[in-house]
Amino acid sequence: HYDDFCKAWLIECKRILKDNGSIWVIGSYHNIFRLGYHLQNLDYWLLNDVIWRKNNPMPNFRGTRFTNAHETLIWASKNKKSKYTFNYQSLKCLNDDLQMRSDWMLPICNGKERLKKNNGKKVHSTQKPESLLHRIILATTNKGDAIFDPFLGTGTTAVVAKKLGRKYYGIEKDKKYFKAAYDRISKTKIIEEDYLDTIENNRSKPRIPFGSLVELGIIKPGTV
């Protein structure tokens, strides 16, 4: 039944996904390989698998296995010919001007960001950190784009989308999660406008060999 369910929602996501859009799925060893299997069978085009390495993972208290210190994300376009968005330069700026790698060291959701009930218990057991969604959304969408999360949970995707000036849509059937998400999104404000503009990809600009600049007299030898 789980495989039928996964296949069904991935089909619907592909139906509404724009030709220049892309999809992200996340999971642990329990389900991510099955999701990847369905993505490929449905002719999504896999672009990257990304490892979210948690720098503060929960330990394996029984000591019977390795500590589960990462989750896997799969990024895919609608098909092989899709012209998807990838803000390469923006990611370099987040990474000390180095090309962003596919292994991301980010903390799990905790502190003030973690939603808790009055009794101190977590509202949602797998609430994702905003930093993770921030990187995904900044990397693969532009200001004004629409983002859809079919499993909204407590609203992290929508919160980050709103902060970054994106449109957001989501589905959540659990009433407790829905209320938490609604309250959280309502309190969220868009961040500084200047920050929302992605940095232009230099690869799209025409390039002139350095030697040609010297030959044309634009640059003199020894001045650079």
Where are these regions (language model features)?
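Core catalytic lobe of class I
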Residues: H1-A180, P221-V224
